[in-house]
Amino acid sequence: QIVRTLKAKDAETKLNKLITLAITMLLAVTILMALCTPLLTKLYVNGSPETMALATSFTLWCMPQIFFYGLYTVVGQILAAKDHFTAYAWSSVGANIISCIGFGTFIALFGRATEHPLDFWTADKIALTAGTWTLGVAFQALVLFIPLTKIGLKYRPIFGLRGIGLRSMGPVAAWSVGIVVIDQLANIVITRTSTNAPMLAQQQFGINPLDVAGNASYQNAYMLPYSLIAVSLATAIFPKISRAVADHNIAEARIDLSQALRNMGVIMCYFAVAFVVMPVPIILALLPSVSVREAILMAGPLVTLGVGLPFASAYLIIQRTFYAFEDGKSPFIFMLFAMGIQAVSVIIGAKLLPPTEWTTMIGMVGAMSYILPIPILYAMLRKRFENNIDGPRIAISYLKSIGAAVATMFIGVTVRDSVYQLVGAQIGAVDGHMNWIQAVACAALLAIVAFIVYVGMLRLLRSEEFKEAIALISSRIPGLRKPTSPNDRLEQDDAENGE
């Protein structure tokens, strides 16, 4: 809808109406969720009254993030539709820096809080951790208004629904709400299962709860691959497909979708390799306060989720493509199958497996839930593209990328112990040791080895998408983007001469 609005003569007025509507709705939802915080905590968390009270306090501090994440998405999509990706992509870095300052201050004042009792968490400590996290998310959203002004759109509140495409957005929004409901119902099952795992392991086997992967391990593992990589790449690709669909150019949209899926497959298969080959160094490099023991607990779900990363990322692009066609029903049907598979499989798995394996099982189920319903997704997508979505070419590309990834995983797993020894590190739940510098060194060395092997395999398999994927990544990194048209080259030459 944003792409269509930008083509209108009074685009600024309509976009201001759209942003104002989004702000109003987000405020209403955020306030409602804040009022329902105790109930939501009971839905998601199992534990003692003290645990529930602490979870409620943290949740209440984090509730404003609903508003700011929503605002970030709306404003960011406007920037993306105008091909301004830099601020949208890098504002999250600022949010992470603010969060790290808060967590770093916490560690400096109080030490690591992993094994402290519940009464350790006083109001000031909760505010310092959850509060700075929310402050970072607020920065991530609000800073986007600066580039929004630079592209010629000065936001001012304008209330009104006429002319913003609400009639066409309404059904899509309704189906999207349905997706959120389905997703959260499955998340309730998953979160309660993973939260119970450490407590039940202690009751049944006498195992220290800190030695069992719980919900924190699952959530951290999930956030690493998906939000940092897949969402960023899908955001960069989506406006191009939207413009083609808005112009009723199905042939161009088909080319864009095919290229996007094939490029995403090449990129995501490499990251899947990284998560399988070196999960512990990656976790320790990105989360310096985590111990080796905790990193090992997080490694299981990270590996299993990494396997499904190429398919979850492909779905993200396909979902946005359906939205470009103003079709919210098809993504809803897919998510109904995917989340149904997750919820049912987790319930069955919790009955058959010991609690020590639950979180890894959840990661595996999450990966499979995006793989198994692919035929359904393919059938629905073909109808939108006149029964032709360049399927054979996409399938061959993914088979080549997966083949190269499997070979790279085998070689990477074979050499990783030698790399650990080279930097003086050791992986073990009891006697493991790896500091931050060693983790970064291991991750870098193994990434280089994996990259060389992966590229070699892609070349051997004659993958045409590899070069396109490299060009796509380079185009999103400031300073590396190459001009692709005569006008672009002239503008770059003028800029360089001006300097």
What are these regions (language model features)?
Residues Q1-E499:
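Membrane-embedded alpha-helical bundles of multi-pass transporters/translocases
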